[in-house]
Amino acid sequence: MATPATVSIEPTLAAIRARWCINSSKTTQSFNDPASMEEVVEYLKGTYSALRKSVACAKLKILHLKQRMQNATNFLARLMSCKNQASRSHHSTAKSAKSALSSDSGDGSDPDPEPETFPSAFITTPTNSIMLKAFFANISITEVAK
């Protein structure tokens, strides 16, 4: 008695054989021939060596991409540290100037401070976006390499 799985497979195999003109008796005979087996082995060896070469090339490309991403991440980290140091020094000079102005005025009212037009204010948003993208790209490359 045939199971439902074999019943559904048998017509499919027959349809494939009919579509591609495969004769099952002819196929089994060709595999018994030692010459055809040698051809198959040689073909598989060639395919395996080509696969190894392509995998090695892909690993090399991933390594180069990982190094480039690390360089970009390091550059952005240095850029952010420079921005933070400049921002801190700007804030400290602004605070000292404010304290000097408040000590000069007798009534204790602060004059309206000028808005900050430090260039880092314009760089912060795009830089943070780039850093996030570089960080997640580095993580995904590391996961692919594993």
From Swiss-Prot:
Q: Where is this region: Disordered?
A: 87-121
**Compositionally biased, Low complexity: which spans?**
94-106
Identify the domain of life: Bacteria
**What is the protein named?**
Uncharacterized protein YagN
